[in-house]
Amino acid sequence: MTIKTRFAPSPTGFLHVGGARTALYSWLYARANQGEFVLRIEDTDLERSTPEACAAILEGMEWLGLNWDEGPYYQTKRFDRYNEIIAQMLEQGTAYKCYCSRERIEAMREEQAAKGEQQKYDGCCRDKAPRDTDEPFVVRFKNPTEGSVVFDDHVRGRIEISNELLDDLIIARTDGTPTYNFCVVVDDWDMGITCVVRGEDHINNTPRQINILKALNAPVPEYAHVAMILGDDGAKLSKRHGAVGVMQYRDDGYLPEALLNYLVRLGWSHGDQEVFSIEEMKQYFKLDDINKAASAFNTEKLIWLNQHYMKELAPEYVAKHLEWHMQDQNIDTANGPALAEVVSALAERAKTLKELAASSRYFYEDFAEFDETAAKKHLRGVALEPLQLLQKKFAELSEWNVEAIHQAIEATAAELELGMGKVGMPLRVAVTGAGMSPAVDLTAFLVGKARCEQRISKAIEFVANRINS
C-alpha cells in the first residue's frame, strides 16, 4: 500500500508555525515511506476564506520546500461531489432531513443544560419520513446509537468513544452547502488518504468522521493528532511568543532550513540529535516518535539554528536567500562583491540574514559619516601617519587581493614601528565607517581598491581637521 498523506489548511489567515509543523510532519511521513503528499485547501468557510490567505499558504509551503505531489485541491470546486454523496446517503437512509427550527434547537439545549445533561441533538427528526414541504431543513448524518468508535492514534495510542456521546452531525446547511466535517471525509476517501496528520484540536472530530466513512463503506485512514505548541511561559502560543505567519520568519531573516529543523524538533526527537538536514529528517522520522505533550516555542533556539545554517550551508545557497533582504533594504549589489563572498565574510557575526544584509551595506554604498564612538577612539591624530602610508602602499599594489593587502598593512606597521592594531583599526574605521568588521585585509579586499583609496582619503581629511580644530 502506498502511504498517502495530506495537509489541508483553511485559507482564513496566514500559514502559522503550528500549521507549518503539521504540514512538515505529514510531508515527512510521506517522504520517509516513499509515499505521496497532497495539498488541499479547505475553503468552505466562504465568509472568512480569502484569496490572499490562500496565496500566503502556498507561498509559505513553497518557501519551506514542502512540495506536494497532488493539488492544490479546493473544496469549493467539489460541491457537486459532496452533494452527490449527500443525496446517496439520504437515499440509503444513513442521513436524514432535519426541519427543527433554530428556536427549537436553542430551547432544547437550554433544557439539557438546566438538567446537567450533555448538549446534543435529541433525534427529533431522525426517524420521520421526509416532508413534502418548502420548509428549510439541514441534513444530518444518522450516527450509530450503540457501540463505540475505536481507533489507534500514532501519537495518543488507542482511543475509544461511545456513540452515545455523539449526536447526529449536520452534514449540509439550510442553504445546501456541505459542512466541514463531511467535506473532509469525502475528500480523504476520494483522494485515497491513508494517514491523517493534524492538530489535537481535531481529535473530537475523528469519531464522527470515522462513523461517516464506515457508513459510506470507505476505508478508514490512520490518524496522528499532534499536540499544540505553547509559548515558553506555558501559555497558549500567541504573536508575542512567535505565532506569526511563516513568511514573517523569511522577512525576519531566517533560513527555511533553520525553521524546518526547529519545527521538526518541536515535539519529535531522534536521540539527542539537535541538527537535522532534510535528508536526515526523512531517514529518521516516525509518527510514533512524536511526543504526546505540548511543546514550548523558544525563539533563542531558533536563532541558534539559524546561525548554524548560515555558517554551514554553502555560501552560494545562503546568498540566494540574502539577495531578497538586500532588495528589501534597498541595497544595490550591482557594484560590489559577490553576495557569496559577503556571506563567507559576515555569516559568523550575524544572527539573521536581515542582520547580515544591514551589516554589509558598506560593501556597496558609501557611508555619510564615521561611527562617532569608533572615530573618537581610532581616528585620532596618531592615526594620520599610518593612514597616509597605507594610502601610498595601496596605490602601489599591482594586484588587489587579501595577501597583498595584508603585506601592505604589515609593512606599514613595521616601518612606523607600530603594533598591527594601531594600523588595522584606523584602516577598519576608514573603510567601513565603524569599529567592527571581519578581518581588515579581507574587508578591504571586498570593499574594493577604488573605494578603499577614496575612503582612506576621507579618513585622512577627517583626522587632519580634527588635529587642526
Curated annotation (Swiss-Prot):
UniProt GO molecular function: ATP binding; glutamate-tRNA ligase activity; tRNA binding; zinc ion binding
Binding annotation for ATP: 239
Gene name of this polypeptide: gltX
Binding partners and assembly: Monomer.
Species whose genome carries this gene: Shewanella loihica (strain ATCC BAA-1088 / PV-4)
Motif ('KMSKS' region): 236-240
Keywords noted in UniProt: Aminoacyl-tRNA synthetase, ATP-binding, Cytoplasm, Ligase, Metal-binding, Nucleotide-binding, Protein biosynthesis, Zinc
Residue sites binding Zn(2+) per the record: 98, 100, 125, 127
Function: Catalyzes the attachment of glutamate to tRNA(Glu) in a two-step reaction: glutamate is first activated by ATP to form Glu-AMP and then transferred to the acceptor end of tRNA(Glu).
Needed cofactors: Zn(2+)
One example of a Gene Ontology biological process annotation: glutamyl-tRNA aminoacylation
GO cellular component entries: cytosol
Stated name of the protein: Glutamate--tRNA ligase
EC number: 6.1.1.17
Catalytic activity from the UniProt record: tRNA(Glu) + L-glutamate + ATP = L-glutamyl-tRNA(Glu) + AMP + diphosphate
InterPro entries documented for this protein: aa-tRNA-synth_I_cd-bd (IPR045462), aa-tRNA-synth_I_codon-bd_sub2 (IPR020751), aa-tRNA-synth_I_CS (IPR001412), aa_tRNA-synth_I_cd-bd_sf (IPR008925), Glu-tRNA-ligase_bac/mito (IPR004527), Glu/Gln-tRNA-synth (IPR000924), Glu/Gln-tRNA-synth_Ib_cat-dom (IPR020058), GluQ/Sye (IPR049940)
Cross-referenced Pfam families: Anticodon_2, tRNA-synt_1c
